[in-house]
Amino acid sequence: MDFNKIGDENVVFQIFKLEMLIMSEFPSFIEEKDKLLCLNVLANLLGGIFENEDKIIPNYKEAVIAALFERLLLSSNQKSTSKSNQMIKLLNNSLAHNNGLPSQRCNHDSKLVYMSLVQNNGLPGQRSNYVCCPLCMEQHCIELLTYQLFAKWRNFPRIDFSPVLQGNRGPRFFYTCFLCNSTFLASA
């Protein structure tokens, strides 16, 4: 596994192969769009790619996802080894009882738990990240608070993702919809 390879011409294809590899291990009852959403968030956040994917034994999904999260925690929270260890323990416990998906420990939909963990330094959060996409009208959008982590893997415009104050409507943020890829402003 090589999580550090950056700038490869075939990185998009390799991420696609990574997604297909993990998707093949998801339980059949998980909806296809939810699988894709989870995996797109995961791959884009980490930029993780596999070399020698043919050597990965089937049914290693739990180890693969745990390794990806471990890499994420180490890169985004290097000063807190204890939190990384705590998160790995949480993953190990939840993966065994939740079809390979991290336990949410809150009211988040499972397809949003990945970004939730990132926004809360590797710990499940209580804050909902749902907003409604104005184009496809689905509540599956995620606040772009970690732009630097996945900008290189998607063609997002280089815009300021800090809160935007607009009159008495309160702080507003740029969001992206991971199903139709639209980017828009919405209240937190």
Swiss-Prot record:
Function: Has a role in meiosis.
Source organism of the structure: Schizosaccharomyces pombe (strain 972 / ATCC 24843)
Protein name as catalogued: Meiotically up-regulated gene 94 protein
This protein's GO CC annotations: cytoplasm; cytosol; nucleus
Principal location listed in the UniProt entry: cytoplasm
Subcellular location: Cytoplasm; Nucleus
GO biological process: meiotic cell cycle
Keywords annotated in UniProt: Cytoplasm, Meiosis, Nucleus
